[in-house]
Amino acid sequence: MAQAGRTGYDNREIVMKYIHYKLSQRGYEWDAGDADAAPLGAAPTPGIFSFQPESNPMPAVHRDMAARTSPLRPLVATAGPALSPVPPVVHLTLRRAGDDFSRRYRRDFAEMSSQLHLTPFTARGRFATVVEELFRDGVNWGRIVAFFEFGGVMCVESVNREMSPLVDNIALWMTEYLNRHLHTWIQDNGGWDAFVELYGPSMRPLFDFSWLSLKTLLSLALVGACITLGAYLGHK
């Protein structure tokens, strides 16, 4: 596989294609085409997601509120070094790892979805609370996969609740967090190429916490309890 160099791959492309995949698993279509419809590295354009079946669009005031009511700062697109195109094997390996994660905890994820209580006013706060707990004790590949899968759950739940414009925001928040908080760790640990080598066809186990209920951990995180979810989410 071609090495991406120090700058790495485009996190936005990875996020967009992962979300597209998770939504397609539930029968939601993305009519805007490929994730590269907007320039690489740019913030997602409002309204680029379109779903079937069609639902009533969220009022503009709610879309704005979803972006403003959050402890996370908005992502500002800045010029930087050119990022390498993401090899298909990276997307494929991440999808397989996410599917493995969701299969192991299918019932827990289903129950967690019902507990999210997503609204345009609470979505970003929910995202921030869970992600901060997830990485409280540091970063590893298992936690990164859990991060992607949680983002996918939020996107699916948003569409299920007829709040599909939230998907644009969730994609932005995921990209923002990857760029600001996870990118350096990923590059220092061999980049996404290392992830593929470690967890590709052989699928080295990422998740070794079957004795602990994911539902319990994520439910506690959702209400802001000070637990360390990340400590149980795999190993480097």
Curated annotation (Swiss-Prot):
Motif (BH3): 90-104
Marked site positions, Cleavage: 34-35
Disruption phenotype: In response to intraperitoneal injection of muramyl dipeptide (MDP), knockout animals show lower serum IL1B levels than wild type. Mutant macrophages release 30% less IL1B than the wild-type cells.
PROSITE patterns: BCL2_FAMILY, BH1, BH2, BH3, BH4_1, BH4_2
Modification Phosphoserine occurs at: 70, 84
Keyword set includes Transmembrane helix: yes
Record keywords: Apoptosis, Autophagy, Cytoplasm, Endoplasmic reticulum, Membrane, Mitochondrion, Mitochondrion outer membrane, Nucleus, Phosphoprotein, Transmembrane, Transmembrane helix, Ubl conjugation
Cellular component GO terms, alphabetical: BAD-BCL-2 complex; cytoplasm; cytosol; endoplasmic reticulum; endoplasmic reticulum membrane; membrane; mitochondrial membrane; mitochondrial outer membrane
Molecular functions per Gene Ontology: BH3 domain binding; channel activity; channel inhibitor activity; DNA-binding transcription factor binding; identical protein binding; molecular adaptor activity; protease binding; protein heterodimerization activity
Tissues expressed in: Expressed in a variety of tissues.
Residue ranges annotated as motif BH1: 133-152
GO BP field: actin filament organization; animal organ morphogenesis; apoptotic mitochondrial changes; apoptotic process; autophagy; axon regeneration; axonogenesis; B cell apoptotic process
Transmembrane parts of this sequence: 209-230
Motif interval(s): BH2: 184-199
The keyword Transmembrane helix belongs to this UniProt entry's keyword annotation: yes
InterPro entries, per database record: Apop_reg_Bcl2, Bcl-2-like_sf, Bcl-2_BH1-3, Bcl-2_fam, Bcl2-like, Bcl2/BclX, Bcl2_BH1_motif_CS, Bcl2_BH2_motif_CS
Membrane topology reported for the UniProt record: Single-pass membrane protein
Function text: Suppresses apoptosis in a variety of cell systems including factor-dependent lymphohematopoietic and neural cells. Regulates cell death by controlling the mitochondrial membrane permeability. Appears to function in a feedback loop system with caspases. Inhibits caspase activity either by preventing the release of cytochrome c from the mitochondria and/or by binding to the apoptosis-activating factor (APAF-1). Also acts as an inhibitor of autophagy: interacts with BECN1 and AMBRA1 during non-starvation conditions and inhibits their autophagy function.
Record comment regarding domains: The BH4 motif is required for anti-apoptotic activity and for interaction with RAF1 and EGLN3. BH1 and BH2 domains are required for the interaction with BAX and for anti-apoptotic activity.
Family: Belongs to the Bcl-2 family.
Record protein name field: Apoptosis regulator Bcl-2
Gene assigned in the entry: Bcl2
